From Swiss-Prot:
The lineage of its organism: Bacteria, Bacillati, Bacillota, Bacilli, Bacillales. It comes from Staphylococcus aureus (strain Mu50 / ATCC 700699). One of its GO terms (molecular function) is identical protein binding. SMART domains: Biotin_carb_C. This is Pyruvate carboxylase. The modification N6-biotinyllysine is found at residue 1112.
Length: 1150
């Protein structure tokens, strides 16, 4: 035996590392080669020396260039080369050049490479050794005509195979004559590209066989043994995916016959070194396919079940050792046995749901499995590894070994689940499905297993919550939160969270239990019998909608939920859902409003939950088909809503009937609502909104069967004296409990409530002290003390109320960026009549449009627009119409006259057009006909209830659409959300997929990210907590990307974030020339939702050209005249600023 002192591995990745380890155990120095693309690959560092093979060579050529590799070997003074598998491992010329240079090639002899490197020669060799072979051509088929001739004789199905190589390349199954020609030419072409040899041969295709290979090893002394078989039947396109040793599905007799055949072949040719003899097995028949004259990827599992190191044996055999000598110490064939079973899974960056397309990118997290009976053979599986498109997508080979196949499979599932690989897609979920499939676990699978088992692809995407959370925090840290001033994260006080035990809450029996017991009518009767006034708390909805632009997040409500359940155990209801909270949750807070409802319902089981329902607008800004309203109410009731406050923004009772019917069907409480506007004390203010008007409406609502009558004073216009008169008249006119809602903008709210209570009101809306006043509701805490000594009082726990107020006073500071400009009582409300819930939202809109400094003008314009539109009731969505028009007129310096005179050439906000089309409803005094004509520009207006014109939504079609888009099941809640807000819902899903469940983050981190050195804890599930520390942030690179270094649960993580404030290649957008009528410019900043035309297209006057959106306000840009589109400067999704050129039209000539 000649000792090998220095060994070069002509390969890369995990097999190179495997060989280095074997050599190190034999005290042999090692040399690695690498390409330019592999400079950071792990195998380079696992050798004693490593050398770049040709800086001018491509990624594959570096490992295929024989002369360059030989040069490195000579310079490094190596005396042996191991080729691994793939690349040059079966290349006869490479082995010959090694021999010529006096370098030992660790592999079979040249004649073996020659006979097995060509599949036709291999077949001939097998026939000579008397092995059964698949009927086929005697040699390569030179032309399609000869292929066709053979097919006519042999019949179908057939397999066309490349004579060279392996790995499933150059192979095609042909099942009928029509497929033959294309398959023949494709197989030849693929063979040429893969192996540099286009020769193919044809054989009979064995349908549905097992693929069994036998591991053999021979030495230079004529000794040959087999190490039993491996089952490689789990394949995709003839490439192995999972291997098992030994095969579960073979009988002992058939196993022995196959292994004997393998030995028979190799002894016949005096084979040397490691190789595998491959067979197809069908029933009790088996057929020789080929020999792989090299080490195989799956050699690991044979090593595990036999205890024999195949790679070390290869090296020692090449050095001249005897298999049965003391260096190798191989047992005699009769003494070689297997212990238990082993399974190998190849973990790759392939995406099974995208036709196994290899993914590329940076591995940002890598956590291995391990433990008893687990083996890992890793290549580029490590954190920070750049996965390129140049090489095999294999990251690591995971092998498990156990005494039984079932235990090995269980160990594999555990190990696969334990792996954490982030930054690239992997096939791990697919492999888990393979392991758990009954066909696999029984051993009753064939080479068609993957093809015939579609349930293997029922893959739930990895939650990857840690990485998604880090990416969101990184992005908001670097780029800030939309409409929040970009600044360092403030050092907020941590809110003290009072809690109440779940057992105590479970003991409460409140209005929720009363409803379940006596039903809606029973609750109404109970309310009327109460001496004290009852409370509805609005802190969870209208209070923060009015004060903080609806921005309060679910987490801050959940934190205080148990205490709220305790404090309001004697209250009537908690208003906590509906209105603007629905779309704002999706759109701005990036959380699911249904999840909020269900989580709060679970935490507060004892008090009625109340929502604001915009009648036929549901929680949207337009009318929806009747079946949408029914479905929305049905789903809301199931999720936890008990009281539906139903209103129409124009007080049109016809619009409220469908919603009332739906609520009654659901067995819930229906509040018929009158929206209060004007001033019943001042006849000069309006001859429309009189006391008689409201009494008439109340009687109409009673006739419709509503359970409770609500007065919604959305702007806080109801003065104390007016409240006394109105409530008194209504109590006389109808036999319904009366529920009053107001806003404290003027500072008169408490007195208004006192007068209403004296007049007999049954329920009032208040908020806890720190979330009350101004545009919110009056303070419940203050009202408690104000009513001391009076006959009617509040049933509430005042100490508990103070505790809630302390909590909210701290939490409110987190939302300071969304506070409105009103800092004190403001009697301007009696002039502009803006709803409290709209004030802070409109202020935010104005700021986003660059009108923050002109908000006083916006408020005045709001008043003027109201009278321009005919003095309408102003509450969502009608208030949005007035607000959109006010912003539009201030932005474009318009007044009432210019709207009438120049309106024909103006593109009005979509909500305004919709209003004048009658899509929201009919104002009590009708429309201003002149203004309607200008705004509609010939469009026809509705004259009846919009729902009568709308086709029912086909929910099953929506389900199919969403399931296709989301690649999985969808809920009824998803369906109704999409119907109400398709774009908003889709954007939310996109954000959820990108960043995960953001409602779990604490609010300061959600809005501001993290400071350097800061640590936050995020509970992502029961008993699962992420502890995240932001270590440091790099400077931006040349592309504007920053690297953020975290420690997550003590493990280093890196995330790459594009800094949007770093301009690498400035893209200056052209501006519209105001004097050029052909230039269509952006009238407001925002984004492009949809471009409807293309260059060269002929358009007509008033034809929609594109749709823009700014802060939920859509505008359709129309052609000012007939013409041809000369240029379009924007695309869907582009951000635009006021004055940006969008489209240029060449006017048509007469």
């Amino acid at each position: 035996m000649k000792q090998i002192k220095k060994l070069l591995v002509a390969n890369r990745g995990e097999i190179a590392i495997r060989i280095f380890r074997a050599a190190a155990e034999l005290d042999i120095s090692t040399v690695a080669i690498y390409s330019n693309e592999d400079k950071s690959s792990l195998h380079r560092y696992k050798a004693d020396e490593s050398y770049l093979v040709g800086s001018d060579l491509g990624p594959a050529e570096s490992y295929l260039n024989i002369e360059r590799i030989i040069d490195v070997a000579k310079q490094a003074n190596v005396d042996a080369i191991h080729p691994g598998y793939g690349f040059l491992s079966e290349n006869e010329q490479f082995a010959r050049r090694c021999a010529e240079e006096g370098i030992k090639f660790i592999g079979p002899h040249l004649e073996h490479l020659d006979m097995f490197g060509d599949k036709v020669k291999a077949r001939t060799t097998a026939i000579k050794a008397d092995l059964p072979v698949i009927p086929g051509t005697d040699g390569p088929i030179k032309s399609y005509e000869l292929a066709k001739e053979f097919a006519e004789e042999a019949g179908f199905p057939l397999m066309i195979k490349a004579t060279s190589g392996g790995g499933g390349k150059g192979m095609r199954i042909v099942r009928e004559e029509s497929e033959l020609e294309d398959a023949f030419h494709r197989a030849k072409s693929e063979a040429e590209k893969s192996f540099g040899n286009s020769e193919v041969y044809i054989e009979r295709y064995i349908d549905n066989p097992k693929h069994i290979e036998v591991q053999v090893i021979g030495d230079e002394h004529g000794n040959i043994v087999h190490l039993f078989e491996r089952d490689c039947s789990v394949q995709r396109r003839h490439q192995k995916v999972v291997e098992v040793a030994p095969s579960v599905g073979l009988s002992p007799t058939l196993r022995q016959r196959i292994c004997d055949a393998a030995i028979q072949l190799m002894e016949n040719i005096k084979y040397v070194n490691a190789g595998t003899v491959e067979f197809l097995v069908s029933g009790d028949e088996f057929f020789f396919i080929e020999v792989n004259p090299r080490v195989q990827v799956e050699h690991t599992i044979t090593e595990m079940v036999t205890g024999i190191d195949i790679v070390k044996t290869q090296i020692l055999v090449a050095a001249g050792a005897d298999l049965f000598g003391e260096e190798i110490n191989m047992p005699q064939q009769k003494d070689i046995t297997t212990l238990g079973y082993a399974i190998q899974c190849r973990i790759t960056t392939e995406d099974p749901l995208n036709d196994f397309m290899p993914d590329t990118g940076t591995i940002i997290a890598y956590r291995s499995s391990g433990g008893f009976g687990v083996r890992l053979d890793a290549g580029d599986g490590f954190q920070g590894a750049e996965i390129s498109p140049y090489y095999d997508s294999l990251l690591v080979k995971l092998s498990t070994h156990a005494i039984s196949f079932k235990q090995a499979e269980e160990k594999m599932v555990r190990s696969l689940r334990e792996m954490r690989i982030r930054g690239v897609k992997t096939n791990i979920p697919f492999l888990i499905n393979v392991m758990k499939n009954k066909k696999f676990t029984s051993g009753d699978y064939t080479t068609k297993f993957i093809e015939e088992t579609p349930e293997l692809f029922d893959i739930q995407p990895s939650l990857d919550r840690g990485t998604k959370t880090l990416e969101y925090i990184g992005n908001v840290t670097i780029n800030g939160f939309p409409n929040v001033e970009k600044r360092p994260k403030p050092d907020y006080e941590l809110a003290s969270i009072p809690t109440v035990s779940s057992s105590k809450i479970a003991s409460f029996s409140g209005t929720k239990q009363l409803l379940d017991e006596v039903g809606p009518k029973g609750v109404a009767e109970w309310v009327k019998k109460q001496d004290d006034v009852l409370l509805t708390d609005t802190t969870f909805r209208d209070a923060h909608q009015s004060l903080l632009a609806t921005r309060v997040r679910t987490k801050d409500m959940i934190n205080i939920a148990s205490k709220t359940a305790d404090v309001f155990k004697d209250g009537f209801s908690l208003e906590m859902w509906g209105g603007a909270t629905f779309d704002v949750a999706y759109n701005f807070l990036k959380e699911n409003p249904w999840e909020r409802l269900e989580r709060l319902r679970k935490a507060i089981p004892n008090v009625l939950f109340q929502m604001l329902l915009r009648a036929s607008n549901a929680v949207g800004y337009k009318n929806y088909p009747d079946n949408v309203i029914h479905k929305f109410v049905q789903e809301s009731a199931k999720a936890g809503i008990d009281v539906f406050r139903i209103f129409d923004s124009l007080n049109w009772v016809d619009q409220m009937k469908v919603a009332n019917e739906a609520v009654q069907e659901a067995g819930k409480i229906s509040e018929g609502t009158i929206c209060y506007t004007g001033d019943i004390l001042n006849p000069e203010r309006s001859n429309i909104y009189t006391l008689e008007y409201y009494v008439k409406l109340a009687k109409e609502l009673e006739r419709e069967g509503f359970h409770i009558l609500a007065i919604k004073d959305m702007a806080g216009l109801l003065k104390p004296k007016a409240a006394y008169e109105l409530i008194g008249e209504l109590k006389s006119a109808v036999d319904l409990p009366i529920h009053l809602h107001t806003h404290d903008t003027s500072g008169n709210g408490l007195l208004t409530y006192k007068q209403a209570i004296d007049a007999g009101v049954d329920i009032i809306d208040t908020a806890v002290a720190s979330m009350s006043g101004l545009t919110s509701q009056p303070s419940a805490n203050s009202l408690y003390y104000a009513l001391n000594g009076f006959p009617r009082h509040l049933r509430t726990d005042i100490e508990g109320m103070e505790s809630l107020s302390h909590y909210w006073s701290t939490v409110r500071t987190y939302y300071s960026d969304f506070e409105s400009d009103i800092k004190s009582p403001n009697t301007e409300i009696y002039q502009h009549e803006m709803p409290g819930g709209q004030y802070s939202n409109l202020s935010q809109q104005a700021k986003s449009l660059g009108l923050g400094e002109r908000f006083d003008e916006v408020k005045d314009m709001y008043r003027r627009v109201n009278f321009l539109f005919g003095d309408i009731v102003k509450v969502t969505p009608s208030s949005k119409v007035v607000g959109d028009m006010a912003l539009y007129m201030v932005q474009n310096d318009l007044d009432e006259q210019s709207v009438i005179t120049d309106g024909y050439k103006l593109d009005f906000p979509e909500s305004v057009v919709s209003f004048f089309k009658g899509e929201i409803g009919q104002p009590v005094n009708g429309f201003n006909k002149d203004l309607q004509a200008v705004i509609l520009k010939g469009q026809e207006a509705l004259t009846a209830r919009p729902g009568e014109y709308l086709e029912p939504v086909d929910f099953e079609k929506v389900r199919e659409l969403l399931e296709e888009e989301q690649q999985g099941p969808v809920t009824e809640q998803d369906i109704i959300s999409y119907v109400l807000y398709p774009k908003v819902y889709e954007q939310y899903i996109q954000t959820r997929n990108q960043y995960g469940n953001l409602s779990l983050l604490d609010t300061p981190t959600f809005f501001f990210g993290m400071r350097n050195g800061e640590t936050v804890e995020i509970e992502i599930d029961k008993g699962k907590r992420l502890i995240i520390k932001l270590e440091t942030i790099s400077e931006p690179d040349e592309n504007g990307n920053r690297t953020i270094y975290y420690a997550m649960n003590g493990q280093a993580r890196r995330i790459y974030i594009k800094d949007e404030n770093v301009h690498t290649n400035a893209n200056v957008k052209p501006k519209a020339d105001k004097s050029n009528p052909s230039h269509i410019g952006a009238q407001m900043p925002g984004s492009v939702t949809e471009v409807k035309v293309s260059v060269g297209e002929t358009v007509k006057a008033n034809q929609p050209l594109l749709i823009t959106e700014a802060m939920k306000m859509e505008t359709t840009i129309q052609a000012p005249f007939d013409g041809v589109i000369k240029q379009v400067t924007v695309n869907n999704g582009d951000t635009i600023a006021t004055g940006d050129l969008l489209i240029e039209i060449e006017k048509a000539t007469d």
